[in-house]
Amino acid sequence: MSSPISKSRSLAAFLQQLRSPRQPPRLVTSTAYTSPQPREVPVCPLTAGGETQNAAALPGPTSWPLLGSLLQILWKGGLKKQHDTLVEYHKKYGKIFRMKLGSFESVHLGSPCLLEALYRTESAYPQRLEIKPWKAYRDYRKEGYGLLILEGEDWQRVRSAFQKKLMKPGEVMKLDNKINEVLADFMGRIDELCDERGHVEDLYSELNKWSFESICLVLYEKRFGLLQKNAGDEAVNFIMAIKTMMSTFGRMMVTPVELHKSLNTKVWQDHTLAWDTIFKSVKACIDNRLEKYSQQPSADFLCDIYHQNRLSKKELYAAVTELQLAAVETTANSLMWILYNLSRNPQVQQKLLKEIQSVLPENQVPRAEDLRNMPYLKACLKESMRLTPSVPFTTRTLDKATVLGEYALPKGTVLMLNTQVLGSSEDNFEDSSQFRPERWLQEKEKINPFAHLPFGVGKRMCIGRRLAELQLHLALCWIVRKYDIQATDNEPVEMLHSGTLVPSRELPIAFCQR
């Protein structure tokens, strides 16, 4: 039976889902990630010469009154298969096109040089799509805004406070003991749940539990007990609240939140109650940390951020809440897909195992510094994020008129950066349907850095990127060293868009002890 957490949608995922049409699935056959650096590049063929045209001249699918292109999306497989439809549309309409769903209109980008052009024109405070239901709740309860809602100088100030801890490799490396503590328990959990064939029922749910426990230990130094046989009420209520908040949030992005609030609809009531539960739990955890380390704040992750940067408590509560929500499912989703890819590519898994064994003596717990000597492990994660990304697109809202390609786009234009389209294109990756980590290690195979952006790009890049990578790299060390991840069938698995990109069925993998 599926647990509540397996059904919850990640923050990042929902964000993406709102900003664009939903996408179609594709069949899945078969990191030290660094942000793109300024470089000398040839003139982009999409921007070279010629007069600019206005946005109305953009190609795109037929837009009908009221519905926009929704009927075509549904005809091509529904909202869960939207990502595949976007691949098709880019082939048909080119690297930049417009699409409208209902009243929501966006411009889609599917070329590295267009993303680079956008990156180079980015303002000091890049904007993303407004999340009205969240803002409505915060205003209603007089709570603060976090990094996913804040804009302008306030966003920069709060992001800078967290960036000092979360974006510096040396600071993140200090968290490996906590991550390993949860991973040790997770290995025991897998042993406990495996049947005689090595199958774990509802694996995605278990991976979410691992991710939740890991981020909570990092943020609060607290374990919620989700990897134990009987989780406590607090953990269950918290997870149920996340599930409810996400489901109601999605509905209020389709119909005006102002209407729900004024009529006090059940959706608004449930949304508000869910946020109340989430904030109550987060506040209790943070207040406990602040009190415990009041005399020595530098010894604690959150206390140091709070005291060093003079954030208000409301700002700290909101930012941590959003960071936690954004981290849980996307990290679990990434681990799920790389386990699947390794199961379908045993030769890659064997090569990865040899690298891990060459660096780590038997039974030695992996440390952050050990990962420096594991380039193939990092390449495996990078390749998995390219082939089977957690989310198929990110977004931007132009805060000034901008020329992209040959089109002049007005201020306020919502841009869909179709990163999954980039990763699946033969123009960017030879044999793009193949899981081949070696491509990231071969100098002769030059890859445009703007063709692979799993954590976004620019100043609003995912602030938890380094932490997520550390969690995933260490998890691979633990899992691959202990288990042979085997495919239990060779039938293709579809990717469906459900906030994150999820498998169409229970993944056919088994954990066989080495």
From Swiss-Prot:
InterPro entries the UniProt entry points to: CYP11_CYP27_families (IPR050479), Cyt_P450 (IPR001128), Cyt_P450_CS (IPR017972), Cyt_P450_E_grp-I (IPR002401), Cyt_P450_sf (IPR036396)
Superkingdom: Eukaryota
Enzyme class: oxidoreductase
Function: A cytochrome P450 monooxygenase with a key role in vitamin D catabolism and calcium homeostasis. Via C24- and C23-oxidation pathways, catalyzes the inactivation of both the vitamin D precursor calcidiol (25-hydroxyvitamin D(3)) and the active hormone calcitriol (1-alpha,25-dihydroxyvitamin D(3)).
Subcellular location: Mitochondrion
Catalysed reactions listed for this entry: calcitriol + 2 reduced [adrenodoxin] + O2 + 2 H(+) = calcitetrol + 2 oxidized [adrenodoxin] + H2O; calcitetrol + 2 reduced [adrenodoxin] + O2 + 2 H(+) = (1S)-1,25-dihydroxy-24-oxocalciol + 2 oxidized [adrenodoxin] + 2 H2O; (1S)-1,25-dihydroxy-24-oxocalciol + 2 reduced [adrenodoxin] + O2 + 2 H(+) = (1S)-1,23,25-trihydroxy-24-oxocalciol + 2 oxidized [adrenodoxin] + H2O; (1S)-1,23-dihydroxy-24,25,26,27-tetranorcalciol + 2 reduced [adrenodoxin] + O2 + 2 H(+) = (1S)-1-hydroxy-23-oxo-24,25,26,27-tetranorcalciol + 2 oxidized [adrenodoxin] + 2 H2O
Cofactor(s) this protein cannot do without: heme
Protein name (record): 1,25-dihydroxyvitamin D(3) 24-hydroxylase, mitochondrial
MF (Gene Ontology): 1-alpha,25-dihydroxyvitamin D3 23-hydroxylase activity; 1-alpha,25-dihydroxyvitamin D3 24-hydroxylase activity; 25-hydroxycholecalciferol-23-hydroxylase activity; 25-hydroxycholecalciferol-24-hydroxylase activity; heme binding; iron ion binding; vitamin D3 25-hydroxylase activity
Family of this protein: Belongs to the cytochrome P450 family.
Keywords: Disease variant, Heme, Iron, Lipid metabolism, Metal-binding, Mitochondrion, Monooxygenase, Oxidoreductase, Transit peptide
Binding positions (heme): C462
Originating gene: CYP24A1
Range of the transit peptide: 1-35
Short name of one Pfam family: p450
Gene Ontology biological process terms, A to Z: osteoblast differentiation; response to vitamin D; vitamin D catabolic process; vitamin D metabolic process; vitamin D receptor signaling pathway; vitamin metabolic process
GO CC annotation: mitochondrial inner membrane; mitochondrion
Species of origin: Homo sapiens (Human)
This enzyme's EC code(s): 1.14.15.16
Clinical condition linked: Hypercalcemia, infantile, 1: A disorder characterized by abnormally high level of calcium in the blood, failure to thrive, vomiting, dehydration, and nephrocalcinosis.
Main location: mitochondrion
